[in-house]
Amino acid sequence: MGAWISRTRVPTPEPDPQEVLDLSRLPPELLLLVLSHVPPRTLLMHCRRVCRAWRALVDGQALWLLLLARDHSAAGRALLTLARRCLPPAHEDTPCPLGQFCALRPLGRNLISNPCGQEGLRKWMVRHGGDGWVVEKNRKPVPGAPSQTCFVTSFSWCRKKQVVDLVEKGLWPELLDSGGVEIAVSDWWGARHDSGCKYRLFVTLLDAHQNVIDKFSAVPDPIEQWNNDIYLQVTHVFSGIRRGIRFVSFEHWGQDTQFWAGHYGARVTNSSVIIRVCQS
């Protein structure tokens, strides 16, 4: 009879630690190129902790300017030019603000949190009038809204405010003071078909001490009863912004015109504050 042949699998040996690629041995300019392909949050949270050399690269300007230079669109080129012009002087003990900027991506997106009430009243400072604020589904779709829900007011003025800290969102003072950015604000308001309503919007640009730098207000005519569940949009762009802006205060009011108990007042949703690079 034939003999049995053992076919036991031989385990693959572990690689020699010395054979593992050590990126720290790369020349700084080549390591910089490699790191520029790593996501910004990973650079800040992990790569920066590897060693002093990596920390110096992540804290420096060159890495982040390399990331920005990869966007060849007109907006990308405009941003790169603006960033180069208004970066603060490099300091060994202070990380380049472009790191937080690239990680948080504050330009071109809505900086208002919970704009449609999808999280209830979270992030808003509210003053309840009548029966107070509630959140309901939209009676008609609102274009571009992240959620088809809205904040609904009552028979007495209901107020709601959110203050956006622009530096906390990833912008830096020299960029805000450069004259190269503008602030676009927008709000949608409407009524239910069987009740008229009133609406107010107040947007204020504030400095670090909460002093007013610029402001905009909208006091449109009331929407009448039997209005086909209409929604209207209010927009404004702050351009040529004066130096010192650090906060945007966004506040709107609403109430009904029938003075009915319950929630028949102005319906507000899809509020937005967007910072963008001036193209002209």
Swiss-Prot record:
Residues 101-277 form the FBA domain. Keywords: Ubl conjugation pathway. The keyword S-adenosyl-L-methionine does not apply. The keyword rRNA-binding does not apply. InterPro entries: F-box-assoc_dom, F-box-like_dom_sf, F-box_dom, F-box_only, Galactose-bd-like_sf. Coiled coil: none annotated. PANTHER family: F-BOX ONLY PROTEIN 27, F-BOX ONLY PROTEIN 6-LIKE PROTEIN. Part of a SCF (SKP1-cullin-F-box) protein ligase complex. Interacts with SKP1 and CUL1. This is F-box only protein 27. The lineage of its organism: Eukaryota, Metazoa, Chordata, Craniata, Vertebrata.
